[in-house]
Amino acid sequence: MKSFTKYTLYLLFAAFVVASCTKEAEVGILPVISGLENEYIATVNQTLELKPIVQEAPNATYSWLLNGVEESTRPTYIFKAPSVAGQHTLVFRASSSSGIAQKVISIEVGKFTPVSASVNVILPLERPAAFPETAEINWSVTKASSDLYRLGFSEADEPLFIAAKAGRYNVKAFAGDLEFEYLVLARAGETVQTPYISNVFDYLPAPGQFVNKLPQYAEGDTHEDMVAKTAANLVGGNPTMITLGGWGGYVTFGFDHTITNVSGKRDFRVLGNAFGANANPRPDAPFGGSCEPGIIMVAYDKNKNGKPDDDEWYEIKGSGNLTAENEAWYEMAVTNKNDVRTFRDYEMTYYRPVTEEKDKPGTINSPSNFATIHKYIRWTDNKGQEGYKIKNVFHNQTYYPAWVKDDKITYKGIRLADNGIDESGQGSYYVLYAFRYGYVDNYPNIHDNSAIDIDWAITKDGKPANLPGIDFVKVYNGVDKENGWLGEASTEVAGAHDLHMLGISIDTIKE
């Protein structure tokens, strides 16, 4: 009896194992299809060869259905686009003994030439081959997934397209009765882009009270060391401040992508530390406080060498780059006997100080006794002027860039009108008034007027530059102003960002 029971149990177990194996064989593993996109775009009369990869499907059979009609049973398929535009659905099926897998594909056919582009990368568009060489071609964007794009032109009149957002952009060329259309498919690139500064190329502040402190100089540091320290402060999303010192001091930096010049919008912002006065005694005064405007130069990487070249720079035409006469504070400055001239060809030379020994100790928080060396750093300019920069009681380090071996440094550029007024009349309350737009460290970072429109860029002869975008920025201090016990007006830079990548939309200023 026990032997019979044991034999019966053995048969039941064997039957279960066989049944399980049979069930697994019946179910199997479904075919796996790869190597096909969900969507394809083709121009009329174009052919597309589709080569799917089918796995886990020995002895499989295949079927291609175009718009519901079987067209082929081969493992590959050639789609022949018709001569008219339209939308098509293609289904690929792979069948095996274990089941059926399928891939549904959408194919758009149009009278255009599809081209792929990466977001925030300039795409040159070729002249249509069918157009006569003498034809005058007009280009326009006829349809766009987003407003964040630019269709511009090179100096050789080559069309250049760039999009700040992924999507589809239809770009048409017209010449008389002739038409040609590109469908630009902008996609995110393989590398992750950041809206912030990614590289610092150069740094040379002019003498000033924060020089050798922001960033901190250490004995033996070279120019390369100070550029690296500047990069450590400015690169990335958590920047810290650097100083440009007195007039002419500069920093040059870049981004890991081209910032798109979107029509009608501000495109980027360079951060400073400007703020408004909270106790200005002047009634109904225009905005002012600590406004130390830095002039902006921009460039895009024409030759794709990854660095700014001397022939690529364009001036951002701020509101006071030609004259300050339209600034709200201009008449106030004239009455105050400020030097309100604007020099577009200014040169200033600073000389290494002869001594760091104090004339007198000076007194902290004393507007009348702040100077420790009155004839500290000698300067001359190309307008026949000369004088000395004062050393104050608040900062004891040398104001001359300590890593510079030369005994003099010359800077060149635009010198803006003097925007600072002692509103106390006693040397105790200086207000530096803001220019209307177009500068760094001129308005608080949260204010729209701290944002920059690339369309403000001009050529050397003052014409609009019409840049498609920019890769590099240079900022230099645009004012030469001593403000009593506050010291010199010194542009500070505390980072920069691409407004479009951050989703910040600010309309431009139109005059």
Residue ranges of predicted features:
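Bacterial Sec-dependent N-terminal signal peptides
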Residues: 1-47, 51-53, 97-116, 181
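A short beta-strand segment in extracellular, disulfide-stabilized domains
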Residues: 45-55, 123-138
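Solvent-exposed loop segments of extracellular immunoglobulin-like
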Residues: 56-63, 135-139, 143
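Surface-exposed, flexible coil segments in extracellular/virion-facing regions
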Residues: 63-81, 143-161
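Exposed beta-strand face motif in extracellular beta-rich ectodomains
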Residues: 86-90, 165-171, 471
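Conserved structural position at the C-terminal beta-strand
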Residues: 94, 173-175
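A domain-level signal for the mature, folded cores of soluble proteins
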Residues: 185-294, 312, 317-511
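Acidic carboxylate motifs that coordinate Ca2+ or other divalent cations, activating on Asp/Glu
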Residues: 301, 305
